[in-house]
A protein has these predicted regions:
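Catalytic domains of carbohydrate-active enzymes, especially glycoside hydrolases
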Residues: 73-88, 140
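Active-site acidic/histidine proton-transfer and metal-coordination neighborhood
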Residues: 16-17, 21-24, 72, 107-200, ...
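Conserved, mostly hydrophobic/aromatic
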Residues: 60, 77, 108, 137, ...
Length: 295
């Protein structure tokens, strides 16, 4: 998933209003059983402590459903039994106007899906732009912003100020070979001398692409882990269904269990965007199998 900088709600308001009306009326007409292959939506249980995901807040990075309008994407998530969302800006753009916030909260409330994380968003030393993002996050109830901040002192000084003021976490997202935060050390060194609310969104697939160990990333970042994108890759370059690549899924979940991870555990599946649900079903089944091995 690419990083978004200064994404606003302009150009999305009309679509957002239509989507809100569709969810509230139940009229998501384009979402029909014929849209997906047999077996889709087989995982219907809620992710509660007694459910198939144990204590984990199993959710989805909405970029997985990027080819669907927001109302459709929320409906799919609900039918999959996923009640936590990390939204990418293409589904819910940043905006702080009270009417817009009310519309988004109504949309989310009607869907039964809770928006707990958001991103990926770029940051520099511009306080007005940063404040707009944090204001939006605070008003809509977001716990953590997945971020790709500049590495300079001014940017991190500003982020120290923002997380303290708003009580919203910054989770630095690693984005594979050549990115600013390619290696585990890049993130560890970036956060170590800053506010405890500045931490990491560990993207397991991108660490595999960078030939880094996602289990090690989780071990080293510990209580600085504010987000996880569960993604699988084979041979450092081929995106796969979760559980069919090189990711040590059980190992990752063991560390998350040990550190009492309480934030969204977001599946992010970037393949087959026009019909991802059958593959998502398999991904989620593999997560459930891995959790069952934790004891």
């Amino acid at each position: 998933m690419r990083e978004y900088r200064n994404v606003s709600r302009r150009g999305f308001l009309k679509a957002g209003a239509v989507a809100t009306a569709a969810v509230c009326s139940g009229a998501v007409s384009s979402l029909s059983p014929s849209s997906f292959s047999p077996g889709s939506f087989s995982l219907m249980a809620a992710d509660t402590a007694a459910g198939p995901y144990g204590s984990f807040k199993m959710g989805i990075q909405s970029y997985t459903l990027r080819d669907f309008k927001v109302a459709e994407a929320l409906e799919i998530s609900k039918k999959l039994g996923l009640h936590y969302w990390e939204s990418f800006p293409g589904h819910i753009p940043i905006g702080t106007v009270p009417k817009y916030i009310a519309e988004q909260n109504e949309l989310l409330g009607a869907s039964g899906v809770k928006l707990v994380a958001y991103g990926v968003v770029g940051f520099d030393g511009n306080e007005s732009k940063a404040r707009e993002v944090f204001e939006f996050a605070k008003k809509i109830g977001i716990e953590s912003i997945s971020a790709d901040p500049n590495k300079d002192e001014a940017t991190f000084k500003l982020l120290d100020k923002m997380v303290e003021e708003y009580g919203v976490n910054i989770a630095i997202h690693n984005h594979g070979p050549g990115a600013k935060y390619d290696k585990i050390d890049d993130v560890v060194n970036a956060v170590k001398d800053h506010n405890p609310r500045i931490g990491a969104c560990v993207d397991t697939g991108h660490y595999l692409r960078s030939k880094e160990n996602p289990v090690e990333a989780l071990e080293r970042l510990k209580d600085r882990v504010f987000g996880v994108h569960l993604k699988d890759v084979k041979d450092a370059k081929i995106f796969k269904i979760l559980g069919e690549g090189d990711l040590d899924l059980v190992g990752c979940l063991k560390i998350l269990q040990r550190i009492k991870y309480k934030y969204c555990l977001a599946l992010e599946y970037e393949e087959n965007p026009k019909n991802p649900v059958p593959d998502i079903d398999i991904c989620l089944a593999n997560v459930q199998k891995a959790i069952a091995k934790l004891g």
